[in-house]
Amino acid sequence: VQTPMCKALCTEVANQVAYDSIQIHGGTGFMRDFNAERFYRDARITNIYEGTTQLQVVAAIGGVIQRANDTRIAELQSLKFEGKLARLKKKLDELYKKHLESVKFVADKKDTNYHDLMSRSLVDNETYVFVGYLMLRDALKDSERENLAERYILDAIPEFEKRYMTIMSDDFTLIDNHRAIIDY
């Protein structure tokens, strides 16, 4: 489950960084005279080489539902954090608890359409939590990484919450109206 999660995260981040670099450079960033154009083109194709993000989600969702990462997450949670890192761990623990709730919510539905619709959000949230704990572990080993861990976790919280709210919304309108939306 960790390999497809990692591939999905890395390819999506590569695309976002490349996109942002073009925005930073304005119109000149997309000209062939600059590396930003090549990075953007290469980042877009990386998803195809690695399998689209959706294929990575399909590969990861079974492990997310079956809780394949729980043992590793428990190991990371058992590390002793102090100060800022302890406060960040508490935030991650809260996200993890919500994530387990949302996984159970989807699994208990036994509705394949809802399961498929929420798979990406579940995999993304699993990734936010897992990577957050990894970042804390690394910050524990090297204090220079504390700010990186803090930034990652604080940025992940609203992204996680958005997906969590979507999962828990029990909203079937996209499923119910998919033909009208697709055929529009």
Identify the role of each PLM range.
Residues 1-184:
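Flavin-dependent oxidoreductase catalytic core characteristic
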